[in-house]
Regions:
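Cytosolic catalytic headpiece
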Residues: 1-72, 76-82, 99, 113-116, ...
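Membrane-embedded transport module
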Residues: 9, 99-175
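Conserved phosphate-coupling serine/threonine residues in phosphotransfer and NTP-handling enzymes
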Residues: 21-24, 88, 157
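Short, acidic/turn-prone active-site loops that include or flank metal/cofactor-
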Residues: 44-51, 88-91, 105-106
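Acidic (Asp/Glu-rich) catalytic motifs at the cytosolic membrane interface
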Residues: 67, 93, 155-156
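Anionic-ligand binding region
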Residues: 90, 97-98
Length: 175
């Protein structure tokens, strides 16, 4: 139940495809995949196979997040663009992972929302700094404003946008 709800929330927040990679048998993998609602599953997958599959997905242009908890997941966790381990997982999985979740799977949704908010803020600030600095450069070049004023405004806008970057993220969950 928890896994199905988490996957539905992740899809609402931009996750396009969920693939389950497991060392379990075909029957066990199919049963779990159907129960939780993954898009695709692969059974009887060895650790090196998980790593290879991650790299194939990346080579095809996908950004890959790997969630794992065991020693066998460690190579794939290391290869993924974003890797998440559970607190109760193996020491090596937690060490290799970018993020260790201290609790339940619902925290994956929070992490995804934080990532979405961070990317949105980075893009907004990037466009703001390019816009402001372009205007100030143009103003200085055309003598609409003095060069010293343009340089001052450039630095002031950079500082103001840097301060904005430090503000708390506005995280909105889609339900």
């Amino acid at each position: 139940e928890e896994a199905r709800e988490v996957l539905e929330s992740l899809r609402k927040n931009g996750v396009k495809k969920v693939i389950m990679l497991t060392g379990d048998s075909e029957n066990a993998a199919r049963a779990v995949a159907e129960k939780i609602g993954v898009d695709e599953y692969r059974s009887q997958v060895l650790p090196d196979d998980k790593n290879r599959i991650i790299k194939e997905l990346q080579d095809a242009g996908s950004t890959v997040m790997m969630v794992g908890d065991g020693i066998n997941d460690s190579p794939a966790l290391a290869a993924a663009d974003v890797s998440v381990a559970m607190r109760d997982g193996s020491d090596i999985a937690r060490e290799v992972a970018d993020i260790t979740l201290p609790g339940d799977l619902y925290q994956l949704v929070t992490v995804k929302n934080m990532g979405n908010a961070l990317i949105k803020k980075i893009n907004k600030n990037h466009m703001a700094i390019i816009g402001c600095n372009s205007l100030f450069m143009l103003g200085g070049i055309t003598n609409v404003i003095g060069l010293n004023t343009a340089a001052f405004l450039h630095n002031a806008s950079t500082m103001a946008i840097s301060v904005d970057s430090m503000k708390q993220l506005d995280i909105k969950e889609k339900s």
